[in-house]
Amino acid sequence: MNKLIRRIVIVGGGSAGWLTAGILAAEHTAGSAPGVKITLVESPDVNPIGVGEGTWPSMRHTLQKMGVSETDFVRECDAAFKQASRFDRWVTGTKDDSYYHPFTPPHGFGEVNLASQWRALAPDQSFAEVVSHQPHLCANGLAPKQITAPEWAAVANYAYHLDAGKFGLFLQKHCVEKLGVVHILDHVKGVKSADNGDIESLRTEAHGDIEGDLFIDCTGFSSLLLGQHFGVPFISVKDTLFCDTALAMQVPYPQPDSPVASVTISTAQEAGWIWDIGLPTRRGTGYVYSSSHTSDDEAERVLRDYLQDFDGSARKISINPGHRESFWYRNCVAVGISAGFIEPLEASALALIELSAAMIRDELPMSRQAMEIVSERYNERFRYRWDRIVDFLKLHYVLSQRTDSAFWLDNRKPETIPGHLQRLLELWRYRPPSHRDFHELEEIFPASSYWYVLYGMGFEQAGVDPKRSDDPGLARQYFEENAGMTEKFIRGLPSNRQLIDHLVKHGIYKI
């Protein structure tokens, strides 16, 4: 029971499997004799779902720690720079209905109650435009850094849009060639259990039994180990988040030098929403919708209307919104879709993989006895994180004022809103969201994210007595400083297209 965990077997490739392998291998020197041995087994016949085309800024640190070159990553993964999410037609459904959720916290956040002063001091501007420079950079199609900036550095916080299929292959090559991960292409035909109920080995078609101390399930919707072998129950959240189907389409640009958006665009529709992601060579688009509120044929018509009758083929993806009751059971932990999946409204899928793999990494090398403690903590933390993701995504629907379809009306019914979110909304009628409302040091959505969505969607607060933190003079100072930074950045930054083209041709200066 006190034997250290030295052999990790990851089942399944794609972004989940290879990102997990890279995060673990980089820290635990998988390619050296004293390091942890990491083996990834994947079927040669199974294609990853490949919908995760948006990341969070955390991906920069993750890739840098893995020893990846940002130049190589952008070139080989068809990656572009992302600075925010933009939500169109979510509030009223009109053409001018739009707000931003940028990656930078509000300027002056935590120093003064910006929300209480925004409407009085800047009534003609949206909240995000007053407190952050990034909505203006996105609106002007600008990049987050200068052409001369080194890898990973920036003047504006950024993440990426990427080709998920190319990303998985890029990580595979890096993990095998640079980090010592053993790659086996084979079919897993069964699971052999140890006397204590753990997984002892995987039975494969051509490589015999593959033994391990810790098994990581990255098999996607099939959840081969955690779901099928161990039978860990699945918790559906479809009564809260209705979207259960997606139609995805890849759309070419009309010209090779077409602008590349530095923002993920989410446009609300009668039964869901359309994502629109800009890559250097194409756009990734799709309609996420509730099959209880529209038909597949109608959904495809809506998507093609949005794309102005683009005649390419659409790929249908069925979503069972929810997650496993526990994510780590005995000596098996699920990462990625095998742990759970919901609509990609705030691009949390890849971020959850990063967080999952990072916690596994930080607890190694553990003993089998210590694994009981680690798994308990892991399950507690990720159940909390899943609950907060569901809350945050539901918030977008709860605050909508749309009345044009049953989908939007049903989303505001009290019985569909998590109790935790209802209690927070009642508190926030009298004060802005605070870090005190959340319990994790690494919140998946911090208080500043709630500010952007609440005030972007017109959330009204009750009149309260003024406090010292409502200082209008200090708020005006921060608003003016943000305006000054915005003007400076607009003058000095290249377009997203210019930066990407220069990077692909000449590379980025390495620190």
Spans of features found by a protein language model:
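N-terminal Rossmann-like FAD-binding beta1-loop-alpha1 element of flavoenzymes
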Residues: 6-35
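Glycine-rich FAD pyrophosphate-binding loop
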Residues: 25-51
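Dinucleotide-binding Rossmann-like beta1-alpha1 core, especially the glycine-rich loop
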Residues: 47-138
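Low-complexity, highly charged intrinsically disordered N-terminal segments
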Residues: 96-170, 174-178, 218, 230-233, ...
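Predominantly flavin-linked oxidoreductase catalytic cores and closely associated redox partners
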Residues: 149-299, 357
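Conserved FAD/dinucleotide-binding core of flavoprotein oxidoreductases
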Residues: 268-319, 340-351, 363, 371
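Short FAD-binding loop at a beta-strand-to-alpha-helix junction that anchors the flavin cofactor
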Residues: 327-345
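Long, low-complexity C-terminal extensions of enzymes
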Residues: 362-511
